[in-house]
Amino acid sequence: MGNSAKKFPPIQGGALILLTLALSLATFMQVLDSTIANVAIPTIAGDLGASFSQGTWVITSFGVANAISIPITGWLAKRFGEVRLFLVSTFLFVVSSWLCGIADSLEALIIFRVIQGAVAGPVIPLSQSLLLNNYPPEKRGMALAFWSMTIVVAPIFGPILGGWISDNIHWGWIFFINVPIGLSVVLISWKILGSRESEIVHQPIDKVGLVLLVLGVGCLQLMLDQGREQDWFNSNEIIILAVVAVVCLIALVIWELTDDNPVVDISLFHSRNFSVGCLCTSLAFLIYLGSVVLIPLLLQQVFHYTATWAGLAASPVGLFPILLSPIIGRFGYKIDMRILVTISFIVYAITFYWRAVTFEPSMTFVDVALPQLVQGLAVSCFFMPLTTITLSGLPAHKMASASSLFNFLRTLAGSVGTSLTTFMWYNREAVHHTQLTEHINPYNPISQSFYHQMNQFGLSDTQTSAYLAQQITSQGFIIGANEIFWLSAMGFLGLLIVIWFAKPPFGTQH
């Protein structure tokens, strides 16, 4: 039996700075890897002789394995120790990244991505719990702010970096960049934390719970990733996945409430702040990550931006978190955490409303970048206060389980958000396309006048119809995006009420 991490004195000085950097880099690396491959799928699929739809399994395979492994992190950490599990997971992440980079077939790449996703699961929750358990109580806010910044900034830089790599060098470097970063994280963490292992508990594994978890979460993630490709519930495959996911997840909750050694600690929801924090974080991340995917898609499909320029237009959101996170971490505890979250949700609502009324066919790069820049204020006040509220009052020995469940729900919400947003966007485009097309008929003098003008410019009626169809599609996508932005603004205003159900005091001193 090892010692509980709680018994070790806090780390101080240069070692503390190095540890913070290493754990934050581990988080950044893992979150970056979940988005960096998205824009490179056409390049990867073409290079490996596969279709685009087959290439999407490069994303799906990682997402499914990752979603399954995150919630069992708490049990694994108790069984093998938090430090040991973190070091092994990070090292295996490095190895699997290298294997992904040298893969010479799509099948091999998918297998290595499954391994990569599975070993990546424990990295984020353990980096969070190790940071909190080894920091001086008075400095935990700053540590959490710096760590949180990587969670919300990494998805922005993933498409930029992935686009640049796929455009300029071999796509394998999307994965190779993890190797030096990951090895540095392992060496620094081992040097500082090697003798600070958490308590090891030899408890039996909950086999039934594990099977239900794998089936439920795996089917749910597959459904979310493949839904649009398979036309959602018009596909028997998607219906079967949905039924299996719902049945298994309901059975999982019932089973875990009665099992003595649950693989997922449902009892954490007895904590009011944990429940409120998970709900607010999950719903907010669902909306936020949906926009992270939607805005580059809109810019590429309608405004013909390259992947790199679409990423650059979205990137200003990272400026304020980089500048303000240390300040909020240093002074945030002087005010009610709920106030910081309220400010965040209000700014989120304002920026989504801003997009809803300004996104139009003639908008410029600045029109996209400016709301992104202001939204950075919301991001700065978002993750650190919500994480603090969620974990407040929990004992140290439950921190790994709480962090893994919290991050699992956040990750799952992000998957739901991206799938739901893209589904709504394409669906609303189809609706608006039909509505707008109805106005193009022989009885509408405006449309007939337009055809006449185009004839004078030398275009035939067929060419004019093709041009109008293209314009209607673009308008449909823009209107659909604006409707989603409106709905997102309303969602954040609704969350303003929920966050005030959290109960002070807040803090990570346990």
Curated annotation (Swiss-Prot):
Ranges of the Cytoplasmic topological domain: 1-7, 53-56, 113, 166-168, 225-237, 300-308, 360-375, 505-510
Keywords carried by this UniProt record: Antibiotic resistance, Cell inner membrane, Cell membrane, Membrane, Transmembrane, Transmembrane helix, Transport
Record Pfam families: MFS_1
GO-annotated biological processes: response to antibiotic; transmembrane transport
Principal location: membrane
PANTHER family: MAJOR FACILITATOR SUPERFAMILY MULTIDRUG TRANSPORTER MFSC
Protein name: Multidrug export protein EmrB
Organism: Haemophilus influenzae (strain ATCC 51907 / DSM 11121 / KW20 / Rd)
